[in-house]
């Protein structure tokens, strides 16, 4: 899929967010329709994204312009493809955040899981460990800083973060991070 494609084209990134739990947890508990990555500021991702769009059988891709509330550079892409299961067009989103790595622990994980279809030789991605992802998820509950404001129609987003926190608390092994 998309994660495999952006890895195969050599795009330098850190895979984060709820979707990376599909690789970090032995048994994934929920699906997500977006891939969140971090790249270093100044990285020209346009050619990587265009080349990746030709690897997996995407029928279309487009950049979606969204206004952010802060000065952090972000870019968003929508990749459309025909589902091999339903034979209907569906999409996956690529959310790119331009910032330096602030994670204490990064690990390499193979793109492999019972819910993912991959082809050819194994592909690995760099991702924060479970402890760091838990820290990210907890920021969702800091609505006056980086989190999701409560009571503004984002209840489902808050519930997803809470669900992930419950899963991660059962898995973490470093309470000092």
Predicted regions mapped to residue ranges:
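Catalytic cores of NTP-dependent nucleotidyl/adenyl transfer enzymes across multiple folds
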Residues: 1, 70-177
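Short, conserved acidic/polar surface loops in the N-terminal third of protein domains
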Residues: 25-28, 48-51, 105-108
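Metal-dependent nucleotidyltransferase catalytic core
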Residues: 39-72
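Active-site nucleotide-donor binding segment shared across nucleotidyl transfer reactions
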Residues: 3-35, 39-41
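Short, charge-rich binding segments
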Residues: 29-30, 37-40, 68-70, 83-88
């Amino acid at each position: 899929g998309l994660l495999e494609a952006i890895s195969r084209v050599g795009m330098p990134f850190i895979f984060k967010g709820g979707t990376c739990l599909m690789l970090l947890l032995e048994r994934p508990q929920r699906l997500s329709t977006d891939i969140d990555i971090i790249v270093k500021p100044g990285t020209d991702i346009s050619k990587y994204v265009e080349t990746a769009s030709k690897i997996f059988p995407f029928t279309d891709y487009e950049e979606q312009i969204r206004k952010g509330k802060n000065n952090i550079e972000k870019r968003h892409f929508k990749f459309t493809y025909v589902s091999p299961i339903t034979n209907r067009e569906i999409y996956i989103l690529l959310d790119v955040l331009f910032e330096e790595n602030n994670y204490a622990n990064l690990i390499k994980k193979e793109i492999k899981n019972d819910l993912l279809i991959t082809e050819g030789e194994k592909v690995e991605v760099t991702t924060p460990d479970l402890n760091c992802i838990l820290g990210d998820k907890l920021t969702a509950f800091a609505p006056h800083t980086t989190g999701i404001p409560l009571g503004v129609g984002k209840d489902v987003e808050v519930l997803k973060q809470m669900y992930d926190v419950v899963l991660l608390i059962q898995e973490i092994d470093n309470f000092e991070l």
